[in-house]
Amino acid sequence: MYGNIDGHPLRVMLPKTLIFNVEGVEVLLTHIGGYPGKYAPGIIQQLRSNNTRLFISGHSHILKVMNDNTLKLLHINPGAAGIYGFHKVRTLIRFCIDNCRIYD
């Protein structure tokens, strides 16, 4: 999937959003998605229509892991792992998905 900094060549080759299933968990991955209580326009409809249990989005470069009790999903913003940008600390998230469970 592409992000806001990617140019036309990547945007024509890659989707804006990825939706896939891992070990029985529906995952939605997009660059600009917001977070529980402040989702980007159109995201709630996608989350509901795909029965999403794990929503991963970025853009803010701020590490956040939050439950959305209304939509019954886990939201992860992994922060920023690159060497360029305004962030001072590189972050990432590691977790497990096994038999419909998200943990660690």
Feature annotation, model-predicted:
Residues 22-23, 45, 50-52, 76-104:
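Binuclear metal-dependent phosphoesterase catalytic core
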Residues 29, 34-48:
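Pre-active-site segment of Zn-dependent metallo-hydrolases
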Residues 17-20, 64-67, 91-95:
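Short beta-strand scaffold segments in enzyme catalytic cores
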Residues 1-24:
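Core catalytic region of metal-dependent phosphoesterases/phosphodiesterases
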Residues 27, 53-54:
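Short, Asp-centered acidic motifs that coordinate Mg2+ and/or phosphate
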Residues 5-11, 34-39, 56-68, 82-87:
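Active-site environment of divalent metal-dependent phosphoester hydrolases
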Residues 25-33, 73-79:
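Active-site-proximal beta-strand elements of phosphoester/diester hydrolases
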Residues 3, 31, 59, 79, ...:
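Divalent metal-coordination and catalytic microenvironments
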